[in-house]
């Protein structure tokens, strides 16, 4: 009799889930089971901590928490998650910290509520609603099998950024080590701090002519890069922009050195030391 009752309850639960809206799913994934912690401040809830548990593979940031809108995903609140494969972002989130969802190596997609006026997702990638800024790329998106130079099995991915994007935000591709090919549209003007930090396999990158700014550590530890062409429109390159890009031996700059704002050791180095056969060509 007891087993029969349990079966009936389970069946009812399944039916309810099948026909329920997003609010019910939000309750299940962001409630006690997921143990998401929030901080309420000035009538708004901010995501403070997301649990790193093997039992939690999807996280939903709800529209509201305790009757107030959830408006912010704080820095480091949903970072370094080992098991999460997808994060859903509610309609009231208007601020996503640059460190908030970094180094989540198993995330295949982000999903943003279509009624969110600040952000959207395109094929699992977060952009601002106006499609001018790329916010976060999921590290495990569209992985395919491949072989590395030593014949070892690896997973790789390729991506084309949407046309019209002007800013690749800080840490947008942070530690996307499986990304081997990236197409950047002609519209991009800014690549911000640590945007491609440790994209270790990325090769044959073409920087657009319209690019004006390359941030600090933008390409640090991008071992796959071998040659970079920097257009005359670039006005500033931040410190350590190409730190530890040990295979990047050719840098062509279509400008004179005196015309640029150059951060400390902006050029390729080997753990901060000069690379002997590095060639930097100025106009």
Question: Whereabouts are the PLM-identified features?
Answer:
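Sec-dependent signal peptide cleavage junction
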Residues: 18-34
């Amino acid at each position: 009799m007891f087993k029969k009752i349990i079966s009936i309850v389970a069946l009812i639960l399944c039916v309810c889930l099948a026909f329920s809206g997003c609010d019910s799913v939000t309750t299940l994934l962001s409630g006690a089971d997921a143990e998401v912690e929030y901080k309420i401040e000035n009538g708004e809830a901010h995501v403070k901590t997301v649990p790193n548990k093997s039992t939690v593979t999807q996280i939903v940031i709800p529209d509201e928490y305790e009757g107030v809108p959830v408006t912010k995903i704080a820095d480091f609140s949903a970072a370094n998650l080992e098991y999460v494969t997808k994060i859903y972002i509610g309609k009231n989130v208007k601020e996503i910290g640059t460190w908030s969802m970094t180094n989540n190596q198993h995330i295949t997609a982000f999903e943003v509520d279509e009624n969110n006026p600040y952000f959207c997702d395109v094929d699992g990638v977060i952009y601002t609603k106006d499609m001018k800024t790329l916010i976060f790329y999921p590290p495990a998106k569209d992985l395919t099998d491949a072989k590395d130079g030593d014949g070892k099995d690896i997973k790789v991915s390729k991506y084309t950024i949407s046309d019209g994007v002007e800013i690749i935000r800080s840490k947008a591709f942070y530690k996307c080590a499986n990304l081997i090919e990236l197409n950047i549209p002609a519209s991009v003007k800014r690549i911000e701090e640590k945007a491609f930090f440790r994209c270790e396999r990325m090769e044959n990158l073409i920087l657009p002519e319209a690019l004006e700014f390359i941030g600090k550590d933008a390409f640090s530890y991008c071992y796959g890069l071998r040659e970079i062409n920097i257009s005359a429109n670039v006005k500033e390159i931040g410190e350590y922009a190409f730190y530890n890009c040990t295979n990047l031996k050719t840098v062509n700059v279509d400008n004179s050195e005196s015309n640029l704002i150059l951060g400390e050791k902006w050029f390729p180095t080997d753990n901060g030391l000069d690379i002997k056969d590095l060639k930097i060509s100025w106009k």
